[in-house]
A protein has these predicted regions:
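Single conserved hydrophobic/aromatic residue that forms the stacking wall/gate
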Residues: 1-10
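Short amphipathic alpha-helical surface micro-motifs
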Residues: 6, 62-64, 150-153
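Short, charged N-terminal beta->alpha structural module
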Residues: 13-15
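Glycine-rich phosphate/pyrophosphate-binding loop and the adjoining helix
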Residues: 107-172
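Helix-loop-strand module that forms the ligand-binding subsite of alpha/beta enzymes
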Residues: 10, 20-116
């Protein structure tokens, strides 16, 4: 469990030092701690409040750096996005977070509705009966998928081998 709210999260500098050293960013924060442990996790749930129809800046900075420097540790592992908003913008933020998973070859875990709850405060979110049911269903679906992956491993079924990535710029 890592929280981008628990400490300052530095934005990505674009210097590439984390990829070169394999030790994360030269700035030590919660992202480095997460990346160091990311390979031990079976699956991931990333959550964010919705700010202006987007995930929070703290989570975006966290995920930018975590996936750039440690994405290979998460490849093939199931992930889910959860968003919380007062009124609107949840589907845009939900989509934004899911893009990190799909570009990293991660199975995306869904629920009976988009993984969102509504309320301005925790007490209000608890009153969102459909949202809370969606969260329970998400938890059950994540547990089921993790069980399926484990059963597959026991039968010798592994994650598909990836081809070397081909990068093409649109302007040459």
């Amino acid at each position: 469990l890592a929280s981008s709210a628990a400490s300052d999260v530095y934005k990505r500098q674009g210097c590439g030092a984390c990829a070169k050293t394999g030790e994360g960013c030269f700035r030590k924060d919660v992202v480095n701690e997460f990346v160091a442990k990311a390979g031990e996790a079976d699956g991931y749930i990333f959550g964010s409040p919705v700010h202006y129809a987007a995930a929070s800046g703290a989570l975006t900075s966290f995920m930018d750096r975590a996936f750039y420097s440690g994405g290979s540790k998460m490849t093939g592992k199931p992930a889910a996005a959860v968003v919380s908003c007062r009124r609107g913008g949840a589907s845009a933020a939900f989509d934004q977070i899911n893009k990190y998973f799909t570009i990293n070859c991660m199975p995306v875990v869904g629920s009976q509705y988009w993984n969102q709850v509504h309320g301005g405060k925790a007490e209000e979110v608890k009153q969102d009966e459909e949202g809370m049911q969606t969260m329970r269903t998400l938890g059950n679906n994540m547990a089921w998928l993790l069980s399926c992956i484990e059963a597959g491993k026991e039968k010798g079924i592994t994650f598909p081998e990836r081809e070397p990535v081909i990068r093409t710029n649109y302007i040459r």
